[in-house]
From Swiss-Prot:
Pfam families: Iso_dh. This is 3-isopropylmalate dehydrogenase. GO terms for cellular component: cytosol. It comes from the Bacteria. Pathway: Amino-acid biosynthesis; L-leucine biosynthesis; L-leucine from 3-methyl-2-oxobutanoate: step 3/4. The gene is leuB. Substrate binds at residues 99, 109, 138, 227. Disulfide bonds: none annotated. It comes from Escherichia coli O157:H7. Its EC number is 1.1.1.85. InterPro entries: IsoCit/isopropylmalate_DH_CS (IPR019818), IsoPropMal-DH-like_dom (IPR024084), Isopropylmalate_DH (IPR004429). The lineage of its organism: Bacteria, Pseudomonadati, Pseudomonadota, Gammaproteobacteria, Enterobacterales. Catalyzes the oxidation of 3-carboxy-2-hydroxy-4-methylpentanoate (3-isopropylmalate) to 3-carboxy-4-methyl-2-oxopentanoate. The product decarboxylates to 4-methyl-2 oxopentanoate. NAD(+) binds at residues 78-91, 285-297. SMART domains: Iso_dh.
Length: 363
């Protein structure tokens, strides 16, 4: 690859800097093995930015992200900043404004049960034995969270509250295309989640998804009601490849998918805009209770790098190399403390070293 790429690196707070260090070790291995020209610049965000600049998202950080091809984000927040007004705290003052500024309308959250980690899955052993590898594609900027009107009015027995589920054609079309394009990189199946037996917004959702599906004759499309989908994820998650969801339904199902893997330390997340620019981050939090102890699981951060390579840099070979290296490490029984269950555990640094070495060796 001859193109030059630039990544904005935002380590953040808590375990963020520790796990980000491991992801950058792996990036070095990718650069060397695949002869990719990738540069990085570090910027403060969240609590670290409050401490150093007096605000959770400094203008220099936003400008640095604007000049990058993608953003690799760590995690933000912690007890130190909880006394601040909500809109000035690291989470609401940094991550949400970044999503809004870059018009990140789609959220991709993979949930995979890795071989050797079946015991962590809360489902029945015979279900866990089948494994699963699901990508939840969630629309982020429309739906009931943002629809108008919303509010409260009246008093006494006539007091009421109301929210409005609104979806425009363009919002459904663009998130559907993300799901179908993602399925082409995976197992060629999309399951669209709705409530088209009741909701007008879901009827439109299903109609438009069917229209977009005609552009992807190689992709199998199924529709499923949200209530049935929550049950089917428990009954047989292996049946799913890509889940296409509205904002509300994706909020619910992505967390359910995460829960059945058994470890938040393994789950990456991507938020994309229409130009393919993305913000990539672990699905878990900043875990301030274990920060600085060199025991955090860096795999979610490393997998976030893999997503960045796949979706923003179109480097699928490099992303797959990272995923294979992680699979190899787990198959060999290499575990950080959250996965060790009394067995010997490796440190954050050691896990990063092992995965980087496996990428370099081309396992």
């Amino acid at each position: 690859m001859s193109k030059n790429y630039h990544i904005a690196v935002l380590p953040g707070d808590g375990i963020g800097p520790e796990v980000m260090t491991q992801a950058l070790k792996v990036l070095d291995a990718v650069r060397n093995r695949f002869a990719m020209r990738i540069t990085t610049s570090h910027y403060d965000v969240g609590g670290a930015a409050i401490d150093n600049h007096g605000q959770p998202l400094p203008p220099a950080t936003v400008e640095g992200c604007e000049q990058a091809d993608a953003v690799l984000f760590g995690s933000v927040g912690g007890p130190k900043w909880e006394h601040l007004p909500p809109d000035q705290q690291p989470e609401r003052g940094a991550l949400l404004p970044l999503r809004k500024h870059f018009k990140l309308f789609s959220n991709l959250r993979p949930a995979k049960l890795y071989q050797g980690l079946e015991a962590f899955c809360p489902l029945r052993a015979d279900i866990a034995a089948n494994g699963f590898d699901i990508l939840c594609v969630r629309e982020l900027t429309g739906g009931i969270y943002f629809g108008q009107p919303k509010g409260r009015e009246g008093s006494g027995q006539y007091e009421k509250a109301f929210d409005t589920e609104v979806y425009h054609r363009f919002e459904i079309e663009r998130i559907a295309r993300i799901a179908f394009e993602s399925a082409r990189k995976r197992r060629h199946k999309v399951t669209s989640i709705d409530k088209a037996n009741v909701l007008q917004s879901s009827i439109l959702w299903r109609e438009i998804v069917n229209e977009i599906a005609t552009e992807y004759p190689d992709i199998e499309l199924a529709h499923m009601y949200i209530d049935n989908a929550t049950m089917q994820l428990i009954k047989d998650p292996s049946q799913f490849d890509v889940l296409l969801c509205s904002n509300l339904f994706g909020d619910i199902l992505s967390d359910e998918c995460a829960m059945i893997t058994g470890s938040m330390g393994m789950l990456p997340s991507a938020s994309l805009n229409e130009q393919g620019f993305g913000l990539y981050e672990p699905a878990g939090g900043s875990a301030p209770d274990i920060a600085g102890k060199n025991i955090a699981n860096p795999i979610a951060q490393i997998l976030s790098l893999a997503l960045l390579l796949r979706y923003s840099l179109d480097a699928d070979d490099a992303a797959s190399a990272i995923e294979r290296a992680i699979n190899r490490a787990l198959e060999e029984g290499i575990r950080t403390g959250d996965l060790a269950r009394g067995a010997a555990a490796v440190s954050t640094d050691e896990m990063g070293d092992i995965i980087a070495r496996y990428v370099a060796e081309g396992v």
